Amino acid sequence: MKRISAVMGITAALAAGALVVAGCSSQGGRVASSDDDSSGGTSKGSGLTIALVTHAAPGDTFWDIVRKGAEDAAKKDGVKLLYASDPDGSKQAQLVQQYTDQNVDGIAVSLAKPDALKSSVQAAEKAGIPVVSFNSGSDAYSALGILAHFGQDESVAGEAVGNELEKQGLSKPICVIQEQGNVALEARCGGIKKVLPDTETLYVNGTDNSAVQSTVTAKLQADSDADVVVGLGAPYTAVILKAVKAAGSDIKVASFDLNASLAKSIKSGDVLFTVDQQPFMQGYESIDSIVLYKQGGFVLGGGKPTLTGPAIVDSSNIGKVLQYAEDGLR
């Protein structure tokens, strides 16, 4: 493979659900029943119950990959995995509190809105429940007393995109944020802007794809200076591609994250490249790290985030990656 250029060294995984607890969505794109539990059916189990709590919005299939990693780890370790999600920070905090009240053995939580989650996370820790974070919150987790974090540095990922765009002669991106106030998404656009100062941020309602498309279409029709539009998630980049077509624009498209559809768009040339944070690893390591902590007091990362990305995926390496994307691993 020519490259899956890990812009920062990716820490190797040391090995990677579902009770819905009042979340507006049991997960991203896949719908689960109210008592869906993914313990994996192993005969030799750790006997642990671990909750995975994300900020997934309904229909966002990115989180299916995170959950796949968590489920595989749970199956390997004989863990009963509980899952719930809500994109609203205060409601996500309520989910954490409900799992604390259930006295689970561990909680893995995404920290898109750390201020909203602070009290519930610290309540879990006070109750003696180990908490790890993943995906969002690499700059916030340690201040909350969280044991470990698995994800990518979103500012560095943004800079990687900016550098890649600059290499291709592009200098005026539109960075489309689908969830205002999400610290990870803001950091991505901030990283791009650090490299390319003419970057413009466009906020859209990520819970309504038709609204996303119409907002981006209108922006493209009104803005003739932009030379590339950047989606901050694979499902949203798919909508952006529709908006580009509807606007009759020849603007370039780049992305963050990956799924099978986006992989095919990179292969076809419709999307220049994406930055993959390898969400399967985030889910897998989050569950496995809690098991390791419970069984031996092990803590990964040495006080630093365990990095799962960023890795550039483009035409040079998509042939290798596409197979894994189609299998739901990338």
Residue ranges and their predicted role:
Residues 1-28:
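Secretory targeting and sorting signals
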Residues 21-42:
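Bacterial lipoprotein signal-peptidase II cleavage site
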Residues 43, 47-73, 77, 82-98, ...:
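Extracytoplasmic "Venus flytrap"
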Residues 46, 195-199, 284-330:
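Hinge/cleft segment of the Venus flytrap/periplasmic-binding protein
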Residues 61-77, 157-161, 183-199, 215, ...:
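Short, solvent-exposed amphipathic alpha-helices that sit
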Residues 92, 149-173, 211-213, 259-262, ...:
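Hydrophobic alpha-helical segments within soluble ligand-binding/sensing domains
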Residues 93, 109-125, 192, 206-264:
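Hydrophobic alpha-helical
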Residues 115-156, 259-267, 271-272, 322-324:
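Flexible loop/hinge segments that line or gate small-molecule binding clefts
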